[in-house]
Amino acid sequence: AGGIAEMAELGPEVRKKTDKLDAVGNTTAAVAKGFAIGSAALTALALFTAFAEEVVKSPGVSSALHGSHFVLNLLEPKIIIGLFIGGTVPFLFCAFAMEAVGKAAFEMIGEVRRQFREIPGLMEGKAKPDYARCVDISTRAAIRQMIAPGLLAVITPLIVGFGFGAQALGGMLAGVTVAGVLLAIFMANAGGAWDHA
C-alpha cells in the first residue's frame, strides 16, 4: 500500500496510514514465519516416523531393526554418510534457490534496460512499457531456475536409498530434518533483521 501511495503521489496523511499498515503486516509476517517453521518441523518428524514404520514392514532390512523398531546406530558408517548428505541438502537447496532469484532478477533488469533503450518516450512517461514481457520473463525464470532445487529434493533420497540402503536413507532424513529446521530458523531471523534494519 505504501508503494502505491508513493507512486500515486498521495498526501502525507495517506502515507502515515500506509506506514502503520506496513508495520502491522511486517510483524504479522515475522510471527507467521515461526509458525510455518514449526509446522514444517512437525511434518518432517511425522514423515520420518512413517518412513520408520514402513521400513519395519519391509523385508530385507533386518540389520536396521532392533526387535520390532527401526534404529539408527550412529556407529554404522552408512548412517553417518546419510547424516552428512542430509545435512548438506538444505544448504544446497538454499544456494540453488538464492542463485535462482539472482538470475531471474538480472534477466528482469536486462529487459527493463532494453525497454528504456528501445521504446521512445518511456523515460519521459509518454509511452507505456511492455508489462506482459516482464511478467513472462519473471514467470519463465522462476519455473526454469527452480528445476535444479526440485530435482535435488526428489533425486537425493532415491540415490541414497537405492545406493546405500534404508539405514543411510534414515540417516539422510534425520540430517535433513535437523539441518533444515535450524537453517529455516536462522534464515527467518536473519531475513527479518535485515528487512527491518
From Swiss-Prot:
The enzyme's E.C. designation: 7.2.3.1
Enzyme class: translocase
Catalyses which reaction(s): Na(+)(in) + diphosphate + H2O = Na(+)(out) + 2 phosphate + H(+)
InterPro entries the UniProt entry points to: PPase-energised_H-pump
Compartments, record wording: Cell membrane
Molecular function GO terms recorded: diphosphate hydrolysis-driven proton transmembrane transporter activity; inorganic diphosphate phosphatase activity
Cofactor (UniProt): Mg(2+)
Keyword field contains Ribosomal protein: no
Activity regulation as described: Requires K(+) for maximal activity.
Keywords: Cell membrane, Ion transport, Magnesium, Membrane, Potassium, Sodium, Sodium transport, Translocase, Transmembrane, Transmembrane helix, Transport
Sites annotated Determinant of potassium dependence: A29
Annotated transmembrane regions: 31-51, 79-99, 146-166, 168-188
Membrane topology term: Multi-pass membrane protein
The name this protein goes by in its record: Putative K(+)-stimulated pyrophosphate-energized sodium pump
Originating species: Heliobacterium chlorum
Taxonomic path: Bacteria, Bacillati, Bacillota, Clostridia, Eubacteriales
